[in-house]
């Protein structure tokens, strides 16, 4: 094992050295990414990017906490919020497709300080999330190989993810396409088997009516509250986490071959498929598994996944191993997407002067290679979990908890300003290549809901023995304002008047 690991390390060092040399010889004149993502890549990245551990593992906790219909209500509410956010992002992304996405939009349509803070917030979010996912990869593989040190699996996963992102954006898109296809296939298979079980064709008799109505007619804890973690409000956070990653669609617009066609196509079809997948999956779980079933609680492994429970009840004895492989696919996909998103955000910040210019350099394949190395350096935090164990892993998860919601808030504010500026400058809204739904109601509702969910992230963590975890989680909020105010005072920026907003369609 020591010899093979040494060989792997040497190969990685040689690979990195070659890429750095290649980058140095080509990047002096290259500062552009390449539009190589096809429509099918964009659609599948948007679809598969949100189907992951949130659905496969934590959905059981949501059903147990809020009840069958409470869980469905929570996912519908969050789904509606995300729908409005993504149509807002879709309108801006088709008008100005850029790798900086909402960071660029915040800079152009709100205030350069706002875009600066959004960009660094999002880069940090995904860079840390990559470290979390690499740790999760090790946990998945230890399901089969419990005696092998975890850091070896994390290292192998890091090398794979780094290599995919270092080759070309087309390689990234193709990899995500097939990883997403695996997840979608499992969900479709789950729904087919689930409904066959509900109708009594497989798995024997199931008392669906009882499972769905027990305990306050399917609502446990009623409306609930953010602080107690019960009821519908108490699970909105978990439901929100499940949908995080949908905003990746905006970042892929910067490298899509034909964003004016591929982005609207993805927006018009993908969101509803995601929502249907989630709602139908939650319904099947709740119909087959009583919310009082202890197996639904604390689902942090494939063996406790609601998918595993359903598969086992219809006779799939190796369901746990199958679902562990699927979860492994999900976390590798998440790490891959996270590496891509954070690299492109750092690249975009550098292009706009918000980060050192060296991060804007690209290889001949259009890869922001120095930005990729910087993101990989942060991802190395995963190896500290081998030293400090579960406690450090928990802190990493907490650190990335709020940043995704802050990005959503930024999308809503940026779009509201974009549309108002568009009208203020006498432009015809009908000529926009894509229209967000129900403006201004949509972004305003999404903004209010996102702020409520963000501020309601289990504030009780700040008290008692969990105060460190609470402080780390809520640190994202003051960090955002430090970045925002620091840039604002240094560069004397102000809220851009609507008639002075830059509505040109050429970014680079």
Curated annotation (Swiss-Prot):
Bilayer topology term: Multi-pass membrane protein
Name of the protein: Lysine-specific permease LysP
Gene3D superfamilies (alphabetical): Amino acid/polyamine transporter I
Positions of transmembrane segments: 43-63, 66-86, 112-132, 144-164, 184-204, 219-239, 270-290, 314-334, 367-387, 393-413, 436-456, 467-487
Its job: Permease involved in lysine uptake.
Compartment(s) of residence: Cell membrane
Superkingdom of origin organism: Bacteria
Disulphide bridges: none
One cellular component term from this protein's GO annotations in UniProt: plasma membrane
Main location: membrane
Record's keyword terms, sorted: Amino-acid transport, Cell membrane, Membrane, Transmembrane, Transmembrane helix, Transport
GO MF annotation, one: amino acid transmembrane transporter activity
A Pfam family recorded for this sequence: AA_permease
